[in-house]
Amino acid sequence: MAKQTIYLTIDDGPSDLTALFLDLLEKYNSRATFFVLGENIEGHQSDIKRICAQGHAIGVHGYCHDYDVVYQSCKVFWEDNLHARKLIEELTGKTPWLMRFQGGSSNTVSKRYCKGIMRKLTRQAASYGYVYHDWNIDSEDWKKQYSAEEILKYIKAEIHDGSYSRPVILLHDRNDLNENVMLVERLLHDLTSEGYTFSVLSKDIIPIHYRVSN
């Protein structure tokens, strides 16, 4: 009996690790969703093209990840976001419809710069042709407090628990997180061996939305 589908989402790339992730996904006949930053595309244009060519999904994570920049106003946020969208569109010939807010839709850091901005942005996303996605399994890899083995154990425990009808894993694609290459290999190897499949966030997937706190 086939087990459930897992949605691996990889934020903040492209980086020098992107091609390695793509190699692993190809090796295990798996798909993922990449939420990319426009400022990282220069020098990695081939990775953006390859993401699409291999059948993965690509979403917009903004041009930059500086909270004090993107969350100063709705106008600035969308200027930043649409700049990144245009870069992706020019490389792939497709207009991305997926997006993920920097820090997620429930972030509270935005309060420092513009009170109530997340309520406005989450309502506005659809008018730009977007569906935004959060996640329900946070690797917390960016904190650098846990080894790849510890993160792997945590993610697998969350999957095996069966509490999520559509598990959406959050990982990051950054040069300072090179242990994530081993982590992704182990995730793909172990879970596909158990009968799980990895697929992309598509339009028929009900998005994970956190409660907006600003």
Pin down the residues of each PLM region.
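Hydrophobic beta-strand scaffold residues
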Residues: 32, 58, 131-132, 198
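Catalytic domains of cell-wall/extracellular-matrix polysaccharide-remodeling enzymes
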Residues: 65-192, 196, 203, 210-212
